[in-house]
Regions:
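Acidic-and-aromatic substrate-binding clefts and catalytic sites of carbohydrate-active enzymes
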Residues: 39-40, 44-51, 74-86, 164-167, ...
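Boundary/entry segment of secreted carbohydrate-active catalytic domains
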Residues: 23-56
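Substrate-binding cleft and catalytic face of glycoside hydrolase catalytic domains
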Residues: 59-199, 203-222, 228
């Protein structure tokens, strides 16, 4: 073989090799923006730091983010229809137009679902376990097909939101939907259908049904289990062990990480240690369960009257991003801030001012090196 022929073969080989290489994904920096359409309906506006008005999703991209997270409720008609599938589509279309990836968060409730409450949708109440699995399947497929028919493909899909105690179980609630507390400050479970402690097999069965429903519409989307308290190794051992032992599977683990709430709830006494423990837990659960991890919710205290506290919050977010990238052996794929755009008077762990401008906390998304 002459040199000319050899060089041609070498060139073709190199071209084919380069074509076969999978493009490395970026580290995902995201925000949960579920409130934005509701804020807009209230007349609230968003601005760059220098006062230029900008739509919130576009502003997030300007601030260095490349992904969004949006929740969906089953029948939120009693709650203004926010986070219905129609409202969800509006928000997802904005993200798609900006080439931002989408994380879809199924709450499987008519309103908020979290560790304290996972109330069964009103239209599913009283159904048997098998009927409720069909309800879950139908709702999941309906929402996903609605998105698909409108050109939206979520990169990630959560089956449940912060399912520390399982999902599709109900507590006694007041007329506004909030749990009623007894004299000892505890909630009263009125229906334990998918509770992890009381009906572990059914919790796993619901999750497995949700997983398969997601894959039936979007087989390439990454389906996620999401728990709170990312620093709590024992929680993840127990809950994910229940799912695995009862035949459920997932593609990725999602974590919530809130150092402020960890202290406020008495789980820890040092905010920085909460972050340290979460990073260690990311590596632990990834190795034990054989999958990647993302921090799908985080947030840090906003107090503009205290510049030192604001800088500390910025530094904590920067550290969370930095260590997720550099200190998890590549298994942590992203960090999402929960509702950074919200007003501090409404929620104190956002990252914007009362008049809709990003605070110094948001600087961490572009400069997380220190």
């Amino acid at each position: 073989m002459n040199m000319k022929s050899y060089l041609k073969i070498l060139l073709v080989t190199l071209i084919l090799a380069s074509c076969g290489q999978k493009e490395q994904e970026p580290f995902w920096l995201g925000a949960d923006l579920g409130w934005i359409t509701q804020y807009e309906a209230w007349g609230h506006k968003f601005y760059t730091k220098d006062g230029q008005e900008m739509e919130c999703t576009a502003l997030m991209k300007e601030l260095g983010l490349n992904a969004v997270r949006h929740r969906v409720w089953v029948d939120p008609s009693k709650y203004g229809n926010w986070c219905s599938k129609e409202d969800l589509l509006v928000k997802c279309q904005r993200a798609k137009a900006l080439d931002m990836e989408i994380l879809l968060d199924f709450h499987y409730s008519d309103w908020w679902a979290d560790p304290a409450k996972q109330n069964i949708p009103a239209s599913w109440s009283g159904h048997s376990y098998e009927q409720m699995k069909q309800d879950l399947w139908n709702h999941t497929v309906e929402v996903l097909n609605y998105l698909k028919d409108n050109g939206i493909t979520p990169k990630w899909i959560q089956v449940g939101n912060e399912t520390r105690n399982g999902f599709l179980w109900s507590v006694k609630s007041n007329k506004f939907g909030w749990p009623e507390l007894d004299e000892n400050g505890n909630t009263t479970i009125t229906e334990s259908m998918g509770h992890v402690d009381r009906n572990p097999e059914q919790y796993a069965g619901f999750f497995a049904t949700g997983y398969e429903a997601c894959k039936s519409v979007f087989p390439k989307s990454i389906v996620m289990v999401h728990l709170d308290n990312g620093f709590d190794k024992d929680l993840y051992d127990y809950n994910l062990g229940v799912l695995k032992d009862n035949g459920a599977k997932w593609d990725m683990i999602g974590m919530s990480l809130y150092p402020f709430w960890a202290l406020d709830g008495g789980f820890r006494t040092d905010e920085d240690q909460v972050i340290t423990d979460c990073i260690e837990n990311i590596k632990y659960v990834s190795k034990k369960f054989g999958c990647d991890v993302m921090i799908v919710e985080t947030g840090f205290l906003v107090d503009e009257s205290d510049p030192a506290r604001m800088e500390r919050s910025r530094s904590q977010l920067a550290r969370t991003i930095r260590e997720s990238i550099n200190n998890t052996n590549g298994v942590c794929k992203g960090v999402f801030y929960w509702e950074p755009e919200c007003r501090p008077s409404q929620y104190k762990l956002g990252a914007f001012t009362e008049d809709g401008r990003p605070t110094v906390i948001m600087d961490a998304f572009k400069d997380w090196s220190e």
